[in-house]
Design a protein with these regions (language model features):
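Sec-dependent N-terminal signal peptides
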Residues: 4-15
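Gly/Ser/Thr/Pro-rich low-complexity, intrinsically disordered segments
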Residues: 18-223
Length: 223
């Protein structure tokens, strides 16, 4: 009986340990979700009552402000729950990300797969840093100011990196470079689009309020 109790206690401890590790620098907040699966959830944002969700935030751009959801309103083709979905063509997108069975890949948009081929999720966005090299910054984007967010790979781990305050895009890129991320892919931001939440030790932490229902897709990390 004591042995069974010890095993149950260990299992409970393992379940409760799933959380989000947070690292901070002078300019950035860095979130490392502890997860076993990633998906691109489309149509409706994961609810805070879903106990298996660790972290979720907006991923790809949304085209039009529509009252109903359709995959064609998501920028470029994307993979949801192992299925390739057709989106609208977006010239601003220069890169992409895919994940499946514990493996992931950041890439140029030209290399984004044409079929799911075993990848569980994927989406296209603005590629900021690839293999440690900063990608070209458009003149219109350079001085654009907001709180920025990116999906990154740092020291072999996936993380969500966010600026602590409103800054220029040019400065955000510099801070990511100084933080020495290997890859960085932009995540949709702006008022309402920045709404996100994560679970830390069983408690839900909301990042920025929800202001509208026009968001269409969320990168979601699961236990």
């Amino acid at each position: 009986m004591k042995k069974v109790f010890s095993i149950l206690s260990l299992l409970i401890l393992q379940i409760n340990c799933f959380a989000v590790t947070i690292e901070t620098t002078k300019d950035l907040n860095v979130y490392y979700p502890e997860y076993s699966k990633i998906d691109l959830v489309c149509g409706q944002m994961p609810k805070t009552s879903q106990k298996d969700v660790v972290f979720c935030c907006e991923a790809a751009f949304t085209g039009e402000l529509l009252n109903e959801f359709k995959h064609l309103n998501i920028a470029d083709n994307h993979i949801c729950n192992g299925e390739m979905k057709k989106g609208y063509r977006c010239k601003a997108n220069t890169g992409g990300f895919v994940w499946g069975k514990g493996k992931w890949k950041f890439m140029r948009k030209a290399d984004f797969p044409t079929a799911a081929n075993g990848w569980n999720m994927g989406f296209c966005q603005l590629l900021i840093i690839h293999n440690g090299e900063t990608r070209p910054i458009g003149s219109k984007m350079r001085k654009s100011r907001t709180i920025y967010r990116a999906l990154c790979e740092k020291d072999g781990k996936l993380c969500i990196v966010e600026s602590k305050k409103v800054i220029t895009y040019e400065d955000f890129v510099k801070y990511l470079k100084d933080f020495k991320v290997k890859h960085a892919l932009y995540l949709d931001m702006g008022s309402g689009w920045n709404h996100a939440w994560y679970r830390d030790n069983g408690k839900v932490v909301v990042l920025y309020p929800k202001t509208h229902n026009y968001c269409t897709n969320w990168i979601t990390f699961y236990k």
